[in-house]
Amino acid sequence: MLTNKSAIKSTDEYKVLNTDSTTLTAEQQLALNFFRPSASYDKSSVKFIDLFAGLGGTRLGFEQACIEKGLNSECVFTSEIKDYAISVYKSNFADSDINGDITQIAPELIPDFDFLLAGFPCQPFSSAGKRNGFLDERGGLFFTILDILDAKKPKGFLLENVDGLASHNYGETLKIIISKLQDLDYQVAWNILDASEFGVPQKRKRIYIVGHKEHTPNLNEFTKTFKTVHEFIE
């Protein structure tokens, strides 16, 4: 999650998000790729689901991108299992009903939606862990996402993970992920982005994988914002 520092405020050990930031975060700019002029959307509501939702940073960026395009948005389904994350998420989005373990919910029970957001567990691909990939139960959660995309056939998705996913198993893991998504008739693009390039006071690289049924997202053109240490101290 590459959330801008000016869009968060502290709450105990964790963070609560707020929508006052005027700087476009990575999530916002990625989400804007969905909304091309040629695409048709019901302005009454762009529906999306938020899986492995964490504190809600990806949702925040998506909702702000909708606002930029003059679109209303509605989160119709949220899934998260960690109690502390659920507590903070509800502080950010008070009207949200949080569903538990997504592996225990049949795709047919998920409401119809236009876009899927998912920061699926990164430990199996992180350089800080054992990097067991799909052999790790958490790594296999990608296939849960795949099952949902196959069953619900939304217009697009935005997936986030650690940058180590790109090099895991000499790049073969990412190739499998891209291939499986393309098999579902999505046009897919990916890129590694650094939080420091979006006005955030830390170097934090993440891989973003974005897919759309109607066009190939452009993940190479971003408005990058760098801030000095002095600006952050102020």
Describe each region flagged by the PLM.
Residues 46, 76, 97, 115, ...:
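Hydrophobic "anchor" residues on beta-strands that sit immediately upstream
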Residues 79:
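The conserved SAM/SAH-binding core of class I Rossmann-like methyltransferase domains
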Residues 89-90:
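Conserved SAM-binding loop
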